[in-house]
Amino acid sequence: MTDSDSGTAAEIEITADLVRDLLREQHPDLAELAVREVAGGWDNQQWRLGDELAVRMPRTERAPELQRKECRWLPHLAPRLPLPVPRPVRVGEPSARFPKRWTIMTWVPGEPLDRTSISRGDHAADTLADFLGALHVAAPAEAPGVVDRGAHPGTYTEGFDHFFRSVALDGRADEVRAVWDDAVAAPAWEDRPVWVHGDLHPANVVVSGGTLSGVIDFGDLFAGDPAWDLAAAWVVLPRGGAARFFDAYAHADGAAIRRARGLAALKSLFLMLMGQNGDRGLPGGKPAWGPAGRAALDRVLSTDGR
């Protein structure tokens, strides 16, 4: 996605000097902390601020709204979650120097999983189960609802088909299709909507000491079907982790596991496509995501559902 209006954030080069100038204008007490760019996500460019903070600068049209969502709900969710998550500290308002809202968040220590690996698989499975068990509670009526993700897998067949056609599946296409078709055939979530992170994949979890140590990027947070997060049993955890995860999580019935496994296949194909785009030098491509996606898909296909 790109901005099309003159003077929008996407057309402004975000540099360390700009970040520091904005801090001097709006948060001068933080302006002398060290500033360095670190890996960001789809929607935000990220700058480390000192040792404990991060500045998130929007680079897509939807990013400011996602930041508002995080600022609204993370203070409510974070205190009861068993892993560190970003917490909003300050807000930067639109100005002549930068036309969009930006935020200062706490920094979650650790290395993103797309740049490292989990060596303590059982511990990571238990940790993820504890985290999602704490997150997946009934959400209030005013919680953000389903937008571009969160509905039943059958709603996303067009997207699945696009990813499916775009990557090489090395003779496993029929297996992948069967997993997806089973998810589409699974009964829908009919309980009360629960809080769902919505975007759990290797770039949005961090690792320390060989296990999960934090979860980041809650911009896609919504209230809905927890299967969207349960897919992380295959997308995030190493081989063998899914069975232990579901035993520890203990709240997923067979239909939820079927939906989650199909969504894990969908997410794996997406990671593979983004890796492929990165290898080809295309905009938005992420070379490190290709191997992560292929490994995740192998885990999806190497299990009978658990």
Report each predicted region and the residues it spans.
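Conserved catalytic motifs of the protein kinase core domain
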Residues: G50, K100, D191-P193, T211
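Generic structural signal for small/hydrophobic residues in well-ordered secondary structure
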Residues: L23, Q46, V55, L74, ...
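ATP-binding pocket architecture of kinase catalytic cores
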Residues: G7, E32-T155, R165-G171, E175
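Helix-rich C-terminal or lid/interface subdomains of diverse kinases
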Residues: D220, A232-R306
